[in-house]
């Protein structure tokens, strides 16, 4: 092949490869917060129970509603109206709850913490100034890795969702009543506050 043609072919090939890479979306990037809504990003990155999947529900109305599946090394992005909400995580009958009070046009984060052998809990990410010892915050040493090593969660198979939802509807009332017996201090640690927004 003519050297000039060979050079032109290599240039075209690299240009095409660059265009393909540029067009490929970055699945670690969180989409913008929808106007008038609050956004909550659930992050999961752990070596504990790494192969186990679990669902996140909203139970604000008193009826479990599946928000999505969150395998390990994934982030589940949820948009909700501003105000008070209750979220549930777990493979019922094992579950835990997170209360949230969120503002419009703000983004919040919560970390999925795996508990051996098959339990999960949700921990709010606090502002740098308000975090207590043992709590996650935007200044926490693990926080950058939680963002970097998690990609956007996909859709859960319908059969899996329906099976787990039936389980949730059966066990939710008793588990929520049990959670209510926690002390105010314990509940506060499991509550995402309006001032915990990013930035």
For the regions a protein language model found, what residue spans apply to each?
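Short loop/turn and low-complexity linker motifs enriched in small/turn-promoting residues
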Residues: 22-199
């Amino acid at each position: 092949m003519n050297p000039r043609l060979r050079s032109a072919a290599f240039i075209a090939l690299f240009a095409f490869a660059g265009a393909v890479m540029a067009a490929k979306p970055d699945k670690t990037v969180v989409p913008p917060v929808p106007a008038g809504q609050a956004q909550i990003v659930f992050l999961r990155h752990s070596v504990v129970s790494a192969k186990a999947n679990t669902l996140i529900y909203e139970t604000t109305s008193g009826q479990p509603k599946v928000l999505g599946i969150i395998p390990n090394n994934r982030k589940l992005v949820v948009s909700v109206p501003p105000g008070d909400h209750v979220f549930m995580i777990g493979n019922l009958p094992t579950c835990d709850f997170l209360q949230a009070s969120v503002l419009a046009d703000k983004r919040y984060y919560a970390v999925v913490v795996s508990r051996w052998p098959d339990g999960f809990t949700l921990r709010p990410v606090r502002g740098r100034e308000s975090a207590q010892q043992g709590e996650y915050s935007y200044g926490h040493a693990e926080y950058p890795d939680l963002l970097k090593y998690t990609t956007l969660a996909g859709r859960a198979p319908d059969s899996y969702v329906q099976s787990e939802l039936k389980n949730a509807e059966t066990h939710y009332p008793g588990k929520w009543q049990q959670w209510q017996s926690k002390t105010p201090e314990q509940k506060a640690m499991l509550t995402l506050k309006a001032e915990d927004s990013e930035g």
